[in-house]
Curated annotation (Swiss-Prot):
Organism phylogeny: Bacteria, Pseudomonadati, Pseudomonadota, Gammaproteobacteria, Enterobacterales
Location in or out of the cell: Cytoplasm
Keyword annotations: Activator, Cytoplasm, DNA-binding, Transcription, Transcription regulation
Domain HTH luxR-type, first and last residues per copy: 138-196
This protein's name: HTH-type transcriptional regulator EcpR
Induction data: Negatively regulated by H-NS. Positively autoregulated. Also positively regulated by IHF.
GO cellular component terms attached to this protein's record: cytoplasm
GO BP annotation list: regulation of DNA-templated transcription
Molecular function via GO: DNA binding
Family designation: Belongs to the EcpR/MatA family.
Bilayer-crossing regions: none
Its job: Part of the ecpRABCDE operon, which encodes the E.coli common pilus (ECP). ECP is found in both commensal and pathogenic strains and plays a dual role in early-stage biofilm development and host cell recognition. Positively regulates the expression of the ecp operon by binding to two TTCCT boxes.
Length: 196
């Protein structure tokens, strides 16, 4: 990858983060037109099921699309995007392959709830349930990534090899592979496919 491509990607990520902080951008990523339009219409559609006004939702909430296209960005910059949404009610919309990561962020940060897009029979009710503040730890439907697995996922996303990860984590290469396999089972995919 060239320097210019790296620069463009960094600019794009910063631009996404800026959009996320603006009060009129309550759905991330605003550049994913189908998701943005679909979720906007869905929120208006469930107006009668939610207790808060649409204006309050636009002002206080951030809805984040955790799909396979954006996972690397969220993994590599989780401290950045979590600080960027501080003070907001964050709702993660998780695709099947990102459910375990969504659960990790729910347990380890101030996330209001997770909507499991792949499991939901009625996404309207699931979304209203989370917006209304009823999502609790008992509602977690899948495994979550452990702290050690998350560290290994982050380092893998940065392009590090298992031997280097083992050195940094002060463990054997076999242990790194075991954690990777466990994470891959929870994510329904090989790590290298998710973080490319």
């Amino acid at each position: 990858m060239t320097w210019q491509n790296d620069y463009s990607r960094d600019y794009e990520v910063e631009n996404h983060m800026e959009c996320q902080n603006r009060s009129d951008k309550y759905i991330w990523s605003p550049h994913d037109a189908y998701f943005y339009k679909g979720l906007s219409e869905l929120i208006v559609d469930i107006d009668r099921l939610i207790y808060l006004s649409l204006e309050k939702i636009r002002k206080d909430f951030v809805f984040i699309n955790l799909n396979t296209d954006s996972l690397t960005e969220f993994i590599n910059r989780d401290n950045e995007w979590l600080s960027a949404v501080k003070g907001k009610q964050v709702v993660l919309i998780a695709a099947r392959k990102s459910e375990a990561l969504a659960n990790y962020w729910y347990y380890n940060s101030n996330i209001r709830g997770v909507v499991y897009a792949g499991l939901s029979r009625d996404i309207r009710k699931e979304l209203a349930y989370v917006i209304n503040g009823r999502f609790l730890r008992k509602d977690i439907k899948k495994d979550k990534i452990t702290d050690r697995e998350m560290e290994i996922i982050r380092m893998t996303a940065q392009g590090m090899l298992p031997k280097s990860i083992a050195r940094i984590e002060n463990c054997s290469v076999k242990t790194v592979y075991t954690h990777r396999r466990n994470a891959e089972a929870k994510l329904y995919s090989k790590l290298y496919k998710l973080v490319q």
